[in-house]
Amino acid sequence: MPKIKTRKAAAKRFRLTGSGKFMRRRAGHNHLLEHKTSNRKRKLAGVALVSKQDLANVRLMLPNTH
């Protein structure tokens, strides 16, 4: 039986926390920032947790994380 491979695109975008949750970046903080408020940019700069609805898909893409 072949080895299970990790989806590298997902591996670059998600990090596993110590409690078993996945962290992700927020969308909308790369460009076109001049019209966004400082408050909005500050909130977009932080990391977010993957929602429980998406968690199963992330785990399928990253099979070697525990």
UniProtKB/Swiss-Prot annotation:
GO cellular component terms, semicolon-separated: cytosolic large ribosomal subunit
PROSITE patterns: RIBOSOMAL_L35
SUPFAM superfamilies, sorted: L35p-like (SSF143034)
This protein's record includes keyword Ribosomal protein: yes
Top-rank lineage group of the source organism: Bacteria
One Gene Ontology term of the molecular function aspect: structural constituent of ribosome
Alphabetically ordered keywords of this record: Ribonucleoprotein, Ribosomal protein
A matching Pfam family: Ribosomal_L35p
GO BP annotations listed: translation
Listed HAMAP family: Ribosomal_bL35
Similarity field: Belongs to the bacterial ribosomal protein bL35 family.
Protein name per UniProt: Large ribosomal subunit protein bL35
Organism the protein comes from: Synechococcus sp. (strain JA-3-3Ab)
UniProt gene name: rpmI
